[in-house]
């Protein structure tokens, strides 16, 4: 794949410029914060009790695991990151962290995350965390991202697993409840990512990453976004119907879902500056956060004690 992009020049790196902030940025803190939150909600919804200290260790391990995957992703994608406006300020591209240091950092943090999850929490949660890191790096980043138009769809498995890990950290099981949490994020990921791809289309074309708008065009992409948005609306109501959350959840999640559908439909009337795509992308982040906040606040079970 090296022929698809020009190599990044890392010859001007000055290690003394590296700061704690740079290593935090290497771990993709925005993504990591959502991973931590959804993982915590998964823990909260498990119908078992766990000591807060163990819960805290589990959250830290999930955070480190997500950061590990993010760091290794930046290491592998450093060539295309240098070509995209959206990613040109990442630490490796700016030259404040060497690529081999980023890889070592990612591997070490990932090892400790999985190890301490196994040592202090349970083996199932540790295995799921290991699988998530492996899937994000090997299946999504290395295999799918630069090869398949379905990169986001298939690769979305890793981003949807944190609440399953959190649930398993408390219950040592995988249940229907945790699978529904998984499905909400899994189905949310494609429309969220394709909205980003709509207004970053030139970037993806420039580095030859086969995102759907670049390969199939914007109209086809918008149709797919609408289809997934309808599926998301249906799946997001399931926690109420299996007794996981109360009637308040049903009403508010339904309203949020209708707004999500409105923004998805508005994409067909977007302006050349992709104003609606940007609005939809921003709302999709708010939507997922608020859905999981609702899952947390309206659940019919209590766990962490």
Curated annotation (Swiss-Prot):
Enzyme Commission number, as recorded: 2.5.1.141
UniProt enzyme class: transferase
Membrane topology: Multi-pass membrane protein
Chief location category: membrane
Sequence intervals crossing the membrane: 31-51, 52-72, 96-118, 123-145, 151-171, 179-199, 225-245, 247-267, 281-301
Family annotation (InterPro entries): Protohaem_IX_farnesylTrfase, UbiA_prenyltransferase, UbiA_prenylTrfase_CS, UbiA_sf
NCBIfam families, sorted: cyoE_ctaB (TIGR01473), PRK04375.1-2 (NF003349)
Protein name as it appears in the record: Protoheme IX farnesyltransferase
Organism: Rickettsia rickettsii (strain Sheila Smith)
């Amino acid at each position: 794949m090296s022929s698809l992009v020009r190599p990044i020049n890392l010859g001007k790196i000055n290690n003394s410029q590296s700061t704690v902030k740079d290593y935090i940025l290497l771990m993709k803190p925005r993504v990591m914060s959502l991973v931590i939150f959804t993982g915590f909600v998964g823990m909260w919804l498990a119908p078992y009790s766990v000591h807060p200290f163990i819960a805290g260790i589990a959250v830290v391990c999930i955070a480190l695991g997500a950061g590990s995957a993010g760091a290794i992703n930046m290491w592998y994608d450093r060539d295309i990151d240098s070509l995209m406006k959206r990613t040109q300020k990442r630490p490796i591209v700016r030259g404040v962290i060497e690529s081999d240091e980023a890889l070592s950092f990612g591997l070490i943090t990932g090892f400790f995350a999985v190890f301490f999850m196994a040592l202090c929490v349970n083996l199932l949660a540790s295995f799921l965390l290991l699988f998530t890191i492996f899937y994000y790096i090997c299946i999504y980043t290395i295999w799918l991202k630069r090869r398949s138009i379905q990169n986001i769809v298939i690769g979305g498995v890793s981003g949807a697993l944190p609440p399953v890990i959190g649930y398993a950290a408390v219950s040592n099981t995988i249940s229907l409840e945790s699978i529904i949490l998984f499905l909400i994020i899994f189905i949310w990921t494609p429309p969220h990512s394709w909205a980003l791809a709509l207004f970053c289309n030139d970037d993806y074309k420039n580095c030859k990453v086969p995102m759907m708008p670049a390969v199939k065009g914007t109209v086809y992409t918008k149709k797919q976004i609408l289809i997934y948005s309808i599926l998301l609306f249906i799946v997001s109501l399931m926690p109420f119907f299996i007794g996981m959350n109360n009637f308040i959840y049903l009403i508010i999640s339904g309203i949020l879902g209708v707004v999500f559908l409105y923004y998805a439909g508005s994409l067909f009337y977007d302006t050349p500056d992709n104003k609606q795509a940007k609005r939809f992308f921003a709302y999709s982040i708010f939507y997922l956060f608020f859905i999981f906040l609702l899952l947390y606040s309206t659940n019919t079970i209590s766990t962490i004690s």
